[in-house]
Curated annotation (Swiss-Prot):
GO terms for cellular component: cytosol. PANTHER family: HISTIDINE--TRNA LIGASE, HISTIDYL-TRNA SYNTHETASE. Its main location: cytoplasm. It is found in: Cytoplasm. This is Histidine--tRNA ligase. GO terms for molecular function: ATP binding; histidine-tRNA ligase activity; RNA binding. InterPro entries: aa-tRNA-synth_II, aa-tRNA-synth_II/BPL/LPL, Anticodon-bd, Anticodon-bd_dom_sf, His-tRNA-ligase, HisRS-like_core, HisRS/HisZ. It comes from Korarchaeum cryptofilum (strain OPF8). Belongs to the class-II aminoacyl-tRNA synthetase family. It catalyses: tRNA(His) + L-histidine + ATP = L-histidyl-tRNA(His) + AMP + diphosphate + H(+). Keywords: Aminoacyl-tRNA synthetase, ATP-binding, Cytoplasm, Ligase, Nucleotide-binding, Protein biosynthesis. GO terms for biological process: histidyl-tRNA aminoacylation.
Length: 428
C-alpha cells in the first residue's frame, strides 16, 4: 500500500490555497516592519550545529545522516536561527542592524501528535546587531500584529528573561548551572507540575530545592508587582533583566503581553528575554515564540553579535484557526473561470477567449480532455471554478461569451467581457 512517513503530510489544493494566503499575510507584516528575505540550504554540516542546540535536540530530535560520497555528516534544518547565525558569520560585511525574514521548512524527529509534525513550516523575523529592548519590543510587536491580522482574539504573549531566573537561582538557591533546570521547566505544559518535579529529582535536586524552584516559577501577578519583589535581590543579572523587561512592557503596551516566570524555552542559546504565544483554546501548544540570543553568532564568527527574533509556527496557526472557525477551506481552486466548449469545433474560439482573460490577469482553464459539454461543466464544479463561461456556435458567430455562476447568467460581447467577469466574481 502506498503511503508517506509518519509526521509528514500532503496538502491538497484547498489547504495549499489557505497556506499561501496565511503566508502572504505574514510576509506582508514582515515587510511592513522593514525586514528583508533570505534563503538558506535545507541541509547544514552536522559539525556546524553540533554542541550548540542542547542535548535533547541533538540526541533525539535532529535528522542526522552521512553522505556516502564525501563521508561528511549532514543534518536537516532543525530551525531557522542557526542558519541565520552561520549566514551572518559568513557575511561580516552585512550592515547592522540586519533585519531578515526567512520562511522555510524545518524537520524534527518528534513523536507526531496534534499540532506536532516532523516536517513543518516556520516564519522567522530576526534583528541582528541591536542589544537594546527596542529590538525585542519590535519582534514581539510583529508577533502580536500577526495574531491580530488573523483575528485571533483570546491569545496572550508570555514574556520572561532568562537572566532574571539565572540571577535568582544564583542568589537565592545557589544554582550556578541553570540550563538542565531550564530544560526541565520548559516541559511544564507537556508533562505538568508532577512531571517537572520528577525531572528535577532525576537531575539530583533535593525535595526542598524542588519546592523552592516550583514556588518561584509559580509566582503570579503583574510585572510591576513581581519586579518590586525581585528588585530587593542584589544581583546584576536580576537588575539588568528587570530594567530590560520594563522597557519592553513600556514600548509594546499591550494587555496581551503578560509576565510569566515559568517561561524559559528549551534551547540553550537564549540569553535574555524569551516569549511564547498561545491561545486559550484549542490547547495546541505555542503558536509563536522567540527571544534574544546574543552569543550564538559568536560561536561561528568568534565575536559575539547581539540578536533577537520571533518564529511563527504556520502549522499550528492554521490548525488552531481552522478549529476556531477563523480559517476555512471554502476556496478549492484559484480558477476564476472555466471555459466550456459547447462543441469540439468551438475549442479554438475558447482558446482565444482564454488568452484574452489570462492577459488581463484572470486564472483561466479550459477543456483539455475533449469531453462533452456536461462533463466539462461537471469538472468545473468539482474543482471549484468561480465562473463558467460557455462558448458555442452562436457565441462564436456573434463574438460573445455566456457567463454563468450560481446566481447570475449573462451573454456579453468580448468588449464587455472583462467588466462583466469582474461583476460575476464580486458576487461568486
Amino acid at each position: 500500500m502506498v503511503s508517506i512517513p509518519r509526521g509528514f503530510r500532503d496538502f491538497p489544493p484547498p489547504m495549499m490555497i489557505l497556506r499561501k494566503r496565511v503566508l502572504s499575510k505574514i510576509e506582508e507584516i514582515f515587510r511592513r516592519y522593514g525586514f528583508d528575505p533570505i534563503e538558506t540550504p535545507s541541509l547544514e554540516y552536522w559539525e556546524t550545529v553540533k554542541g550548540k542546540l542542547g542535548e535533547e535536540a541533538e540526541n533525539k530530535l535532529m535528522f542526522i545522516f552521512p553522505d556516502f560520497f564525501s563521508k561528511e555528516w549532514y543534518t536537516l534544518r532543525y530551525e531557522l536561527t542557526f542558519p541565520l547565525a552561520r549566514y551572518v558569520a559568513m557575511h561580516p560585511e552585512t550592515p547592522l542592524p540586519f533585519k531578515r525574514y526567512h520562511i522555510g521548512n524545518v524537520w524534527r524527529h518528534e513523536e507526531p501528535q496534534k499540532g506536532r509534525y516532523r516536517e513543518f513550516l516556520q516564519c522567522d523575523a530576526d534583528i541582528v546587531g541591536s542589544p537594546y529592548p527596542e529590538a525585542d519590543a519590535e519582534v514581539i510587536s510583529v508577533n502580536i500584529d500577526a495574531m491580530k491580522s488573523f483575528d485571533f482574539e483570546n491569545f496572550r504573549v508570555r514574556l520572561n528573561d532568562r537572566r532574571l531566573l539565572t540571577g535568582v537561582f544564583e542568589e537565592e538557591l545557589g544554582i550556578n548551572n541553570p540550563f538542565p533546570i531550564y530544560r526541565a521547566i520548559d516541559k511544564l505544559d507537556k508533562i505538568g507540575v508532577d512531571g517537572v518535579k520528577g525531572e528535577l529529582a532525576r537531575l539530583g535536586a533535593h525535595e526542598s530545592l524542588i519546592g523552592r524552584i516550583m514556588e518561584l516559577i509559580s509566582t503570579r501577578g503583574s510585572f510591576n508587582e513581581i519586579s518590586n519583589t525581585f528588585r530587593r535581590i542584589e544581583n546584576d543579572k536580576v537588575k539588568v533583566a528587570l530594567d530590560h523587561l520594563e522597557e519592553i512592557f513600556s514600548i509594546v503596551s499591550d494587555d496581551r503581553l503578560v509576565f510569566d516566570l515559568s517561561l524559559v524555552r528549551g534551547l540553550d542559546y537564549y540569553t535574555g528575554p524569551v516569549f511564547e504565544t498561545s491561545v486559550s483554546e484549542p490547547r495546541i501548544g505555542s503558536l509563536a515564540g522567540g527571544g534574544r540570543y546574543d552569543r550564538l553568532i559568536g560561536l561561528y564568527s568568534g565575536k559575539d553579535v547581539p540578536a533577537t527574533g520571533v518564529s511563527l509556527g504556520v502549522e499550528r496557526l492554521i490548525d488552531a484557526g481552522l478549529e476556531l472557525g477563523i480559517f476555512d477551506l471554502s476556496e478549492r481552486s484559484y480558477t476564476d473561470v472555466f471555459i466550456v466548449s459547447v462543441r469540439r469545433e468551438n475549442w479554438r474560439y475558447a482558446w482565444r477567449i482564454s488568452r484574452i482573460l489570462r492577459e488581463r490577469g484572470f486564472s483561466t482553464s479550459l477543456d483539455l480532455m475533449r469531453r462533452s459539454q456536461s462533463a466539462q461543466r461537471e469538472y468545473a464544479n468539482k474543482i471549484g471554478a468561480k465562473v463558467i463561461a460557455f462558448v458555442g456556435p452562436s457565441e462564436e458567430e456573434t463574438e460573445t461569451v455566456t457567463l454563468y455562476s450560481r446566481d447570475l447568467r449573462k451573454t456579453v460581447k468580448i468588449s464587455e467581457l472583462i467588466d462583466s467577469l469582474r461583476e460575476f466574481l464580486s458576487v461568486s
